[in-house]
Amino acid sequence: MRSKVEILPSTLIFHELIGLEIKVSNSTNPSLIGIRGRVINETKNMLVVENSESRELKIPKADSEFVFRIPAELSEKGRRSDIFVKIQGNLLLSQPENRIKNIKKLRKWG
């Protein structure tokens, strides 16, 4: 049985984002503010979010701010409530697979 990977607020930017719920809390493009949904894909510069109407929306990471919901079952052991984490999109600007590799380096050396 595979062990569950914990997602902590301090390491969220290194984790897989697909499947997490998200809200755009700020953006240089005012029409993006308030968009909510689930991340269904990610590229170096974009998050693809499926909203409640099953529409796929492409949101640039640069110049946007996101609030991610980390479900209690994926967060710290013993936590009973979800965690909401605000992240500047510029911190996510890299290919997802490279960003995920960086957490392995942190764990190895940290």
From Swiss-Prot:
Where is coiled-coil annotated?
A: none
Q: What's this protein's family per the entry?
A: Belongs to the eukaryotic/archaeal RNase P protein component 1 family.
Q: Gene that codes for this? A: rnp1
Q: State which Enzyme Commission number(s) the record gives.
A: 3.1.26.5
- The name under which this protein is listed is Ribonuclease P protein component 1
- List the SMART domains: POP4
- Superkingdom, taxonomy of origin: Archaea
Which InterPro entries does this one have? RNase_P/MRP_Rpp29_sf, RNP1, Rof/RNase_P-like, Rpp29/RNP1
The protein's organism comes out as Methanosarcina mazei (strain ATCC BAA-159 / DSM 3647 / Goe1 / Go1 / JCM 11833 / OCM 88)
**Keyword entries, A-Z:** Cytoplasm, Endonuclease, Hydrolase, Nuclease, tRNA processing
Oligomer status and interactors: Consists of a catalytic RNA component and at least 4-5 protein subunits.
**What is the role of the protein in this entry?**
Part of ribonuclease P, a protein complex that generates mature tRNA molecules by cleaving their 5'-ends.
Give the disulfide map. Answer: none
Tell me if tRNA processing is a UniProt keyword of this record: yes
The UniProt catalytic activity note for this protein reads: Endonucleolytic cleavage of RNA, removing 5'-extranucleotides from tRNA precursor
Alphabetically, which GO biological process terms does the record hold?
tRNA 5'-leader removal
Compartment list: Cytoplasm
Output the Gene Ontology terms for molecular function.
ribonuclease P activity; RNA binding
HAMAP family linked:
RNase_P_1
Any single Gene Ontology cellular-component annotation: cytoplasm
